[in-house]
Amino acid sequence: MAKKQYSGVRESKPGRINDLGTTGKEVEEQFRKGCLKKADRTFAQGLQCQQINSMAALMSLEDSVFISHSPQGCVGCSIMAVDMFRVGQAHRGIKNIRNPRIIVSNVDQKSVVFGGEQKLREAVKKAVERYHPKLAFIYASCASGIIGDDIDAIAYDLQEEYPDTVLVPIHCEGFKSKICASGFDAAFLAINKYILKKESVPKEKGLVNLFAPTTVSYADQKEMERMLHNIGVEVNYIPFYSSHYGKIMRSHIRIR
């Protein structure tokens, strides 16, 4: 039987428990008996959304531009991730602190009624022609997902026009999952689909891509590098700060 590919929606994993209200002792007992069940509750968004997490996961990747197919407010909410990126640079001794390159297509009421694909095309073209990035990440949003704008088709159509830039659509619509951390998975799945599997290049034996979002501190990063170094593994910690397109492609193993 063929193994079912993970969709990027965390609650789709078999045996996944997202909602639970009990003691640690009861959790252990129920888990051992195989009768652990998630609670039945309503849902309200109390944290950042999936799109913000998808953007935060890749924000420090060099040679990149980030295109949000959304209303302006969605990108405004990403300021938290931008701050984390800037602080992370300072912790790593980077003197010239830089901001990520973010462009928004500005989905408005007219776009919702008549479609916003033309706005996205224009945003992608402006982003690529202005910054000439190696990677251009195209993020879906709640609004663009609800009206059905096809970010995959637009990326496919424009890829031939911009062969020096890899266009990567990321499906991080907020209504797909009740767990905002699914946004991290959406970003990493997109890297695997559009970058790591795009072409075959020589691998560096013993070089590991260690995927982690910007919520991981510099101290945690150094500790993970130390532990892996002890077993003879060189770490390419991505998408943090010093990583780039070519080094991702050369990785021998991937860890998340």
Task: Locate each region found by the language model.
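An N-terminal assembly and electron-transfer interface module characteristic of large anaerobic redox
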Residues: 1-256
